[in-house]
Amino acid sequence: MLRYAVIFFIIALIAALFGFGGIAAGAAGIAKILFMIFVVLFVVSLFWGLVAGRG
């Protein structure tokens, strides 16, 4: 589960690069939305991995 958390975090960083860096100005809005989605998925996956690891 922590592997998925890291993958989501990396995807979120890439989305932030495109969204906040001005590289893809036309798709900045979409990239910002994707960034937030993947950050949420990262946090959920991280939490899930920590909780599942204790069981």
Curated annotation (Swiss-Prot):
Cell location: Cell membrane
Its membrane topology: Multi-pass membrane protein
Keywords on record: Cell membrane, Membrane, Plasmid, Transmembrane, Transmembrane helix
A GO term from the CC aspect: plasma membrane
Pfam families hit by this protein: DUF1328
KW Transmembrane helix (keyword) present: yes
Transmembrane segments: 5-25, 33-53
Alphabetized InterPro entries for the sequence: DUF1328
Highest taxon, organism lineage: Bacteria
Family label: Belongs to the UPF0391 family.
Protein name: UPF0391 membrane protein RSp1666
Organism: Ralstonia nicotianae (strain ATCC BAA-1114 / GMI1000) (Ralstonia solanacearum)
